[in-house]
Amino acid sequence: MQENLVIVESPAKAKTIEKFLGKDFIVKSSFGHIRDLAKKDLGINIGEGYKPVYEIPGDKKKVVDELTKLAKSKTVWLASDEDREGEAIAWHLTEVLGLPVDRTKRIVFHEITKRAILEAIEKPRTVNMDLVNAQQARRILDRLVGFELSPVLWKKVRPALSAGRVQSVAVRLIVEREREIIAFRSAAYFRVVAQFYAAGDPEKTLFKAELSSRFETEAQAETFLQSCIGATFTVAKAEEKPAQRYPAPPFTTSTLQQEAGRKLGMSVSQTMSVAQHLYEQGLITYMRTDSVNLSQQALAQCKEEITKLYGEKYSRWFNYKTKTKGAQEAHEAIRPSYIERQEIEGTPAEKKLYDLIWKRTVASQMVCAELDRTTITIDMSGSSNQFVAQGEVVRFDGFLRLYSESTDDDQAAESGEGLLPKLTAGDRVLPSQITATERFTSAPARYNEASLVKRLEELGIGRPSTYAPTITTIINRGYVVKQNRDGQKRNYAQLTLTGEKIASKTLSENYGKEKNRLSPTDIGMVVNDYLEEQFGPIIDYNFTASVEKEFDRIAEGDITWDKMIDEFYGPFHKMVDSAITTQTAKTREVRILGNDPKTGHIVKARIGRYGPMVEIEGNEGEKGRFASLKKGQLIESITLEEALELFALPRDLGQLDGEELMVGIGKYGPYVRYGKSFASLAKTDDPYTIGYDRAVEIVRAHQAAAAAANTPLKSFPEDADMLVKNGRYGPYIAYKGKNYRLSKGAKPEELTLDDCLKIVAGSKK
């Protein structure tokens, strides 16, 4: 029997740790939580001080049995992660395995390295019940909210809906942003940019300067350009200032999620999954943290690595302070376990994320970039308007040699020019060209996953462990969709003054293109509106942030968890009772869009049985015509013209082999129908625009697949009824009008008649 049993959450983590410990240690995984609130009913005894009712899920009983046997070892070490969730796992293990909570050894570490593991073994502690209670309070509160809110939504909105405390706030943010976009009205203006060169410069080296004023109309812009003809342009002032650009601090959970989204295109959940693998392999420190601190050892390793790669002048120690609201346990920032290790083996995603973490960590300890920023202000005779030229030159790259932080803006911000000419006040400059270009104000950008995490963190809502599951949940519930939008084409005017002539032309551009942006669905908007109306305080941003602070106070031992729950539950339960009894409409609002020009009948948008739709009312006593909204369309913003386009389906594309070829949308999505057969369209095919040739291609592929399915993979002359076929879900046996599934891994081409008869006989038992 081993002297010591170490219990961790995951098999990968167990495998890594076992390499560092001797033969006296056995390391086993609990595979996450070994028990949870009972799934049947509420799982909380409200009348007994909110006492939770825990149960061991069926899929964990085998794990628990094994750990119970092994727990008879001399010493049990609980090595789950060092956060509230990990502390709760450790406590549940003591409860289920019958271990004394006040004597069982609890070890924690930020990184899975031999040094860290052995240090933890040297300094064990016991389970921190304050951290356990904070996690338990969150779990109980979220169960209470979900359990009591969901039936209200079933009754008042639509069956099978659900709501959550933090998730509902995230949906609210996305809904509010969508309504800002719907309400936004773009305004045109004209931006004036000149290309100047210094008088007396034989090379006529050009530099760009922008007019400090903007014009609302093309006529105003043209009038200004007319005034530039023959005008004198003189430098009013030229300022040159040294500047520094500081490196970004090492990654926290949220900044890693944001930067991985911007630089690598990873979703929040993908980032956390890859980071988890890196951590369990001992390659990075713990990935759920809101700290930007680095250990003294890590700082020393960074200095050594920077000096080796770039020289000592690039190294500087930075001590960063955590600014996040309610930052939790004193973890380190996310960093490589071994700073000297620049590259790793692994999947492409693991390599990319590790490289990002390595660069950010090392760059955080490099010197600032040294810049020269120049601003030249140019006066124009006969006008109060001024042109301004800005230039920026990097004199010493510092940390920029290794890493530069991205921004949330999809379009790179226009930076100033590089080196500007040496000019002083009173110097004359001459215009080579002055251009007035029509621009347009932009609507607020929809959130992507990274910017939503950033906003939640700014509001103090959620914690490092909750961001990814929150986003996953609201998408899975159908309240939010992540989608791309093709840009739209628009024309814009441009006036150019060259010499004494003004040329005018119309150009075109695409705008509004989006990738992986979060939009609310119609049902998401309906649920949000209902929750705001009936449960406004619960999804209030400040209130949700204050609940997080209460969890923090529990973790610090300042308040008891049951008191905190009681103060929340009383007012909340009254809201639930009020919402159930009030005669609130089911919020199935109908939006009248106008009248159908062909029939004069009313066209309206609403949520139907199968989702958002539009309807053209029929004559009295007759049914109307219905059409589903396209992905990305909303009841709240769809126009009459867009709604009428939806009734273009089904479309008649002509004849194929003497049969009608039709395109439409059915219960299971877009399809092509030829005769009595149906073939699904690919995701890239638009039923409103698909042409005849593409439809025929889909039909022929469908026919070929059907023919292949009807052709037996194997037949037997001695029994004509026995056939081995290839079906939609794989190979199967067809025998005397019935079908029989093959076992996983069976090779249909190797089956004999006896094999097939045994399968048939076995299925009948």
Residue positions per predicted region:
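Basic, low-complexity terminal or inter-domain segments flanking catalytic cores
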Residues: 2-5, 16, 23, 71-74, ...
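C-terminal or mid-to-C-terminal helical accessory/interaction module adjacent to the motor/catalytic core
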Residues: 112-194, 240-244
